[in-house]
Amino acid sequence: MSIRFQKAAALSNFSRYNPNSGRGFYESYFIRANHPKDPKAFWIRYTLFSPKSKPKDSIGELWVIYFDGAEVFSSKTEIPWSQCQFPRKQFSVQIGDSYINNVVAKGQSNHLQ
């Protein structure tokens, strides 16, 4: 893989959110995995939501979904913007204690239903 391609791929993951724009904004990053043999899967989504003309009301949302082969369990947690990071110069998203970057992802919920 060329260095040019690697740089373009990295840049494509940087957040595009500009809190000074006043425009509404929605951006998501996610990771999912399926068990290779059993009908099991999980999905974790890290989302930034900023309502139009109200950047002070921006929040981070952590969505967690788990399928055990018979049932689907899900949760959505809203986190205050003060506990979130969506940098524009690197791929390192954080929502509360959950995060995703080029190397690792962590997301958990104690509210699966």
Regions found by a protein language model. Name each.
Residues 1-113:
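Targeting-peptide/extracellular-domain and disordered-appendage signature
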